[in-house]
Design a protein with these regions (language model features):
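FabD-like malonyl-/acyl-CoA
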Residues: 18-210
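Short, intrinsically disordered, charge-balanced linker/junction segments flanking boundaries
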Residues: 1, 209-214
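Helix-enriched interaction subdomains in cytosolic or periplasmic regions
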Residues: 1-15
């Protein structure tokens, strides 16, 4: 969708913007300056970055300076599934949902993918940023990608040892259950927590929420 929309921008001269915040214009405000932008969590998807190592044959060797277990951090079982395991579009959707429901693999693959993509931009294409910024988890990706921080291995160890994304705000979401005083058996077959983009005035949303128990 992004590829089609960007192409259309050159045809009709209009900007492209999505509800999630993606933006493209053929008329940038500045000239010749380049910024690397690093997105937040949950931005990787099945098949993303599958051509990076082809673009830059030396990428794997350089990646070892960022992690001694780069393959593990990329989570190839999600990013690069073997074709015999995916036989239909429905199976692909199921794998993507499983990926989305696995915060730690999603975060680790997102950060390590950002590191690799930055390496390709700088070493294979010779593009150096004049500035960089990251949103949420993107701050972590930015600091690792640009060499401000060293090895990603300690980050992975802390992430996997912490209960935060295993059961506090993911999985059974025990933090939410404790705050709302819910039982373990509540919300077993329905969504406990969701977020939405609402195109409405804050006052209208606040008023509508007054009728809700939670």
């Amino acid at each position: 969708q992004a590829q089609k929309s960007v192409s259309r921008c050159f045809e009709d001269g209009k900007d492209w913007q999505t509800p999630s915040g993606s933006f493209f214009t053929t008329k940038p405000l500045g000239q010749e300056k380049i910024a690397f932008v690093y997105p937040g969590g949950f931005n990787t998807y099945v098949g993303s970055g599958n051509s990076l190592f082809e673009m830059d044959p030396e990428l794997h060797e350089r990646s070892l300076s960022y992690s001694s277990k780069i393959k593990t951090l990329l989570h190839p079982e999600f990013l690069f599934p073997q074709s015999p395991s995916i036989q239909s579009e429905e199976e692909l959707k199921q794998l993507q949902q499983q990926f989305y429901d696995s915060p730690n693999p999603m975060f680790e693959s997102g950060i390590s993918s950002a590191v690799l993509a930055t390496q390709v931009m700088r070493n294979a294409f010779g593009i150096e940023p004049h500035a960089a910024f990251g949103y949420s988890m993107g701050e972590v990706s930015m600091l690792f990608s640009l060499g401000v921080w060293g090895s990603m291995d300690p980050m992975s160890e802390v992430l996997n040892a912490s209960p935060l994304f295993h059961e506090r705000i993911a999985g059974p979401m025990n933090s939410v259950r404790e705050y709302w005083k819910l039982k373990d058996t509540d919300f077993q077959n329905e969504s406990l927590w969701s977020w939405y983009t609402l195109r409405a005035e804050p006052e209208l949303v606040t008023k509508a929420l007054e009728k809700r128990e939670r």
